[in-house]
Amino acid sequence: MSGNKFDQEKVDLHVLDPFFIEGTARVAQFGEQKYGRSNWMQGLTQTRIINAIKRHIAQIEKGEDIDEESGFHHAYHAAWGCQVLAYQHRNGQTHLDDRRWSESVRDADTKIGTCEGISGHTVPCMYEGPFGRLHPVDGEKDGLVMSFVQSEADEGTAQGDPIQQLQQMISEWADQVYPDRTVENALTKMMLHEIPELLHGKAMDPAEFADVAILLFDVAHLQGIDIAQAMREKMEINQARDWKIDPATGLMSHVKPKGMMETIRDAVQGIGDAARIMAAPSRLLNGNNMELAEYTAETLPKPPEKPWEITIPNWALKTEEGTHIKLRAGSGVFGRVKYQSQCILMHKNMRKRSHLETYYCATIKDTVTEDEYNVPWSEIEPWTN
């Protein structure tokens, strides 16, 4: 009876849960659909699998159990990744071992020996134990082999590129001194220790600059980033941009090209959401942005003191026909519609929004035909997001 008391509803550690096996099998099917082509073309490297396992474990730690993409528990995904790693090891697929370091049996006097991996790595071959090939022979020691992972194609470039040589030197030293470090460790030290030292009186000390650069280079290495190539590509982008000093912060920033929405907002600044024009004459939409901005600024009235009291008549609301937005037709000779003081600042979801978010009105002074108000969705969407 005492055994039942303590064992009730606890996990049986000596058996495999059939529901867990089924869940992992379903995740395997999901993985085949998502990664099957990549696996068939070149195989899944161990670093990629390990990173996927880490992501799922991290989500569990954050309190999320179910993966939004697959609908299965994150534990099933992690188990599937572990299965792939075990399969690659068991079948000697050393060409997929791209880990920065890997365990190896250094003693040459082994029962089975070691399998040579890529980039100087060695894959450990374990010995027969009481439950199969799980445990090393008593008295044998496992060691860590540190090596900088670099493809043969990059070796020639690294020999002549001082930045890549420097990154390699930093990573090899860091692997020996702090092999279990993470990206978060390096970034935290850089942000909380090294950079504040530069900001507080040590900006003239070359060693302090070097400390920041060393951490930055190591973070790039941990992420598998060739920092030299990344800087070259980024500089090409920076050289093509326009730069100016932000008067609010005093910092240099690149100038983002203004689109239609930004141009209108500048012209009607201080009038709330007046820039959200839902239906304007197509001749203006297809014209110059500044012409549209000036036209909008002229037609906008002053904001009322109580905007929530604005009443928008039903006949002024838009209608939707197919892929176009269309204002309700009025009356007039030859089908010409004259819109005077009608609300054209409408959101496509306006009827569902609260009265406090009522948009202001504008007046279209010109007399235009109904067809001129037919605007394709593709031209309206950027204005209403």
UniProtKB/Swiss-Prot annotation:
Pathway: Purine metabolism. It comes from the Viruses. It catalyses: dGTP + H2O = dGMP + diphosphate + H(+); dATP + H2O = dAMP + diphosphate + H(+). InterPro entries: dATP/dGTP_diPOhydrolase_N (IPR044038), dATP/dGTP_dipphydrolase_MazZ (IPR007538). It is an enzyme of class 3 (hydrolase). One of its GO terms (molecular function) is nucleotide binding. Keywords: Cobalt, Hydrolase, Metal-binding, Nucleotide-binding. Its cofactor is Co(2+). It holds the Pfam family dATP-dGTP_PPHyd. Its EC number is 3.6.1.9. Catalyzes the hydrolysis of dGTP into dGMP, which is needed among other for the first step of biosynthesis of dZTP (2-amino-2'-deoxyadenosine-5'-triphosphate). Belongs to the Caudovirales dATP/dGTP diphosphohydrolase family. This is dATP/dGTP diphosphohydrolase.
